[in-house]
Amino acid sequence: MEALWACWVTLRQWGLTNSPNPLFKNPKTRIQLKPEVQWELDQAETITTDRLAHAFETRTRWYQTINNAFGQYDFLALPSAQVFPFDVAQHWPTEIEERQMTTYHHWMEVVIGGTLSGCPVISLPAGFDDQHRPMGIQFIAPIGEDKKLLEFALAYEEALPWQDAYAQIGK
Protein backbone atom coordinates (compact mmCIF):
# COMPACT_ATOMS: atom_id res chain seq x y z
CA MET A 1 0.00 0.00 0.00
CA GLU A 2 2.90 2.35 0.65
CA ALA A 3 3.96 2.15 -3.01
CA LEU A 4 0.42 3.04 -4.10
CA TRP A 5 0.32 5.88 -1.59
CA ALA A 6 3.61 7.34 -2.87
CA CYS A 7 2.37 6.94 -6.45
CA TRP A 8 -0.93 8.68 -5.75
CA VAL A 9 0.69 11.56 -3.87
CA THR A 10 3.22 12.09 -6.66
CA LEU A 11 0.60 12.06 -9.42
CA ARG A 12 -1.72 14.31 -7.41
CA GLN A 13 1.01 16.86 -6.78
CA TRP A 14 2.25 16.68 -10.36
CA GLY A 15 -1.31 17.37 -11.51
CA LEU A 16 -1.39 20.49 -9.37
CA THR A 17 1.77 21.82 -10.97
CA ASN A 18 0.15 21.49 -14.37
CA SER A 19 -3.06 23.21 -13.32
CA PRO A 20 -3.96 26.39 -15.16
CA ASN A 21 -5.48 27.74 -11.93
CA PRO A 22 -4.18 31.31 -11.52
CA LEU A 23 -4.50 31.05 -7.71
CA PHE A 24 -1.63 28.56 -7.75
CA LYS A 25 0.67 30.63 -9.93
CA ASN A 26 0.21 34.09 -8.43
CA PRO A 27 2.22 34.56 -5.18
CA LYS A 28 -0.34 37.10 -3.89
CA THR A 29 -3.23 34.64 -4.15
CA ARG A 30 -1.23 31.50 -3.39
CA ILE A 31 -0.46 32.79 0.10
CA GLN A 32 -4.22 33.00 0.71
CA LEU A 33 -4.69 29.28 0.08
CA LYS A 34 -4.95 27.05 3.12
CA PRO A 35 -1.60 25.74 4.39
CA GLU A 36 -2.30 22.19 3.21
CA VAL A 37 -2.70 23.34 -0.40
CA GLN A 38 0.44 25.45 -0.17
CA TRP A 39 2.28 22.40 1.17
CA GLU A 40 1.03 20.33 -1.79
CA LEU A 41 2.27 22.96 -4.22
CA ASP A 42 5.65 23.18 -2.49
CA GLN A 43 5.99 19.39 -2.58
CA ALA A 44 5.03 19.35 -6.26
CA GLU A 45 7.99 21.55 -7.09
CA THR A 46 10.35 18.85 -5.77
CA ILE A 47 9.11 16.07 -8.08
CA THR A 48 11.90 14.71 -10.26
CA THR A 49 11.42 13.00 -13.60
CA ASP A 50 12.62 9.74 -12.03
CA ARG A 51 10.04 9.99 -9.27
CA LEU A 52 7.32 10.77 -11.80
CA ALA A 53 8.37 7.86 -14.02
CA HIS A 54 8.35 5.56 -10.99
CA ALA A 55 4.83 6.73 -10.12
CA PHE A 56 3.59 5.95 -13.62
CA GLU A 57 5.28 2.52 -13.49
CA THR A 58 3.61 1.81 -10.14
CA ARG A 59 0.24 2.85 -11.54
CA THR A 60 0.72 0.55 -14.53
CA ARG A 61 1.57 -2.40 -12.26
CA TRP A 62 -1.47 -1.63 -10.11
CA TYR A 63 -3.69 -1.45 -13.19
CA GLN A 64 -2.41 -4.89 -14.25
CA THR A 65 -2.91 -6.33 -10.76
CA ILE A 66 -6.46 -5.08 -10.39
CA ASN A 67 -7.30 -6.12 -13.94
CA ASN A 68 -6.11 -9.66 -13.12
CA ALA A 69 -8.40 -9.71 -10.06
CA PHE A 70 -11.36 -9.16 -12.35
CA GLY A 71 -10.56 -12.51 -13.91
CA GLN A 72 -11.96 -14.03 -10.70
CA TYR A 73 -14.37 -11.39 -9.37
CA ASP A 74 -17.13 -9.25 -10.86
CA PHE A 75 -16.51 -6.46 -8.36
CA LEU A 76 -14.01 -5.56 -5.68
CA ALA A 77 -15.25 -4.13 -2.37
CA LEU A 78 -13.49 -1.94 0.17
CA PRO A 79 -14.62 0.41 2.93
CA SER A 80 -15.22 3.90 1.61
CA ALA A 81 -13.33 5.48 4.51
CA GLN A 82 -10.83 4.50 7.18
CA VAL A 83 -12.67 6.36 9.91
CA PHE A 84 -16.21 7.31 10.73
CA PRO A 85 -17.14 10.99 10.29
CA PHE A 86 -15.26 13.17 12.74
CA ASP A 87 -15.91 16.52 14.39
CA VAL A 88 -15.97 19.41 11.95
CA ALA A 89 -13.55 21.33 14.18
CA GLN A 90 -10.91 18.65 13.59
CA HIS A 91 -8.91 19.34 10.41
CA TRP A 92 -8.27 15.64 9.84
CA PRO A 93 -7.49 12.52 11.85
CA THR A 94 -3.81 12.52 12.75
CA GLU A 95 -3.81 8.89 13.88
CA ILE A 96 -5.83 5.77 13.07
CA GLU A 97 -5.37 2.67 15.23
CA GLU A 98 -2.00 3.99 16.47
CA ARG A 99 -0.79 4.65 12.91
CA GLN A 100 0.26 8.24 12.32
CA MET A 101 -1.28 9.97 9.32
CA THR A 102 1.66 11.66 7.61
CA THR A 103 -0.36 14.20 5.62
CA TYR A 104 -3.72 15.90 5.74
CA HIS A 105 -5.19 13.37 3.32
CA HIS A 106 -3.55 10.15 4.46
CA TRP A 107 -6.71 9.24 6.37
CA MET A 108 -8.44 8.78 2.99
CA GLU A 109 -5.86 6.28 1.73
CA VAL A 110 -8.42 3.51 1.22
CA VAL A 111 -9.87 5.25 -1.85
CA ILE A 112 -6.65 5.52 -3.85
CA GLY A 113 -6.75 1.96 -5.17
CA GLY A 114 -9.92 2.61 -7.10
CA THR A 115 -8.75 6.04 -8.19
CA LEU A 116 -5.42 4.80 -9.53
CA SER A 117 -7.00 1.84 -11.29
CA GLY A 118 -9.00 4.03 -13.65
CA CYS A 119 -11.93 1.69 -13.02
CA PRO A 120 -15.47 2.84 -12.29
CA VAL A 121 -16.08 3.08 -8.54
CA ILE A 122 -19.23 3.75 -6.57
CA SER A 123 -19.68 4.24 -2.83
CA LEU A 124 -22.84 2.99 -1.19
CA PRO A 125 -24.16 2.99 2.38
CA ALA A 126 -22.89 0.14 4.54
CA GLY A 127 -24.40 0.97 7.92
CA PHE A 128 -23.87 2.98 11.06
CA ASP A 129 -21.81 2.74 14.20
CA ASP A 130 -23.30 2.93 17.70
CA GLN A 131 -23.14 6.74 17.51
CA HIS A 132 -25.26 6.71 14.30
CA ARG A 133 -22.34 7.79 12.16
CA PRO A 134 -22.54 6.40 8.62
CA MET A 135 -19.99 4.25 6.86
CA GLY A 136 -19.92 3.29 3.23
CA ILE A 137 -18.54 0.59 1.03
CA GLN A 138 -16.93 1.23 -2.33
CA PHE A 139 -17.41 -1.18 -5.18
CA ILE A 140 -14.95 -1.25 -8.06
CA ALA A 141 -15.86 -2.72 -11.46
CA PRO A 142 -13.68 -3.50 -14.47
CA ILE A 143 -12.96 -0.71 -16.92
CA GLY A 144 -15.88 -0.33 -19.31
CA GLU A 145 -18.36 -1.94 -16.91
CA ASP A 146 -19.90 1.30 -15.66
CA LYS A 147 -23.44 0.19 -16.55
CA LYS A 148 -22.97 -3.13 -14.76
CA LEU A 149 -21.73 -1.28 -11.66
CA LEU A 150 -24.69 1.12 -11.69
CA GLU A 151 -27.14 -1.77 -12.10
CA PHE A 152 -25.50 -3.52 -9.16
CA ALA A 153 -25.70 -0.34 -7.07
CA LEU A 154 -29.40 0.05 -7.82
CA ALA A 155 -30.10 -3.57 -6.86
CA TYR A 156 -28.02 -3.15 -3.69
CA GLU A 157 -29.92 -0.07 -2.57
CA GLU A 158 -33.30 -1.59 -3.42
CA ALA A 159 -32.47 -4.74 -1.42
CA LEU A 160 -31.53 -2.92 1.80
CA PRO A 161 -33.78 -0.70 3.94
CA TRP A 162 -31.53 2.37 3.96
CA GLN A 163 -34.37 4.86 3.93
CA ASP A 164 -35.36 3.82 7.47
CA ALA A 165 -31.78 4.09 8.70
CA TYR A 166 -31.34 7.58 7.24
CA ALA A 167 -34.44 8.75 9.08
CA GLN A 168 -32.77 7.80 12.39
CA ILE A 169 -29.69 9.97 11.89
CA GLY A 170 -29.53 12.66 14.53
CA LYS A 171 -32.17 11.12 16.80
Model-predicted regions and their roles:
Residues 2-14, 86-93:
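Short glycine/threonine-rich loop-to-helix capping motif typified by GTGT followed
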Residues 10-67, 79, 83-84, 123-126, ...:
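Short helix-loop capping/hinge segments that flank enzyme active sites or metal/cofactor-binding pockets
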Residues 15-32, 105-108, 145-158:
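Short, basic, helix/turn surface patches
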Residues 39, 63, 92, 107-110:
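Tryptophan-centric aromatic hotspots in well-structured domains and transmembrane helices
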Residues 53, 64, 72, 115-171:
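Structural helix-boundary/capping segments
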Residues 54, 86-107:
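Short, surface-exposed loop/helix-turn segments at secondary-structure junctions
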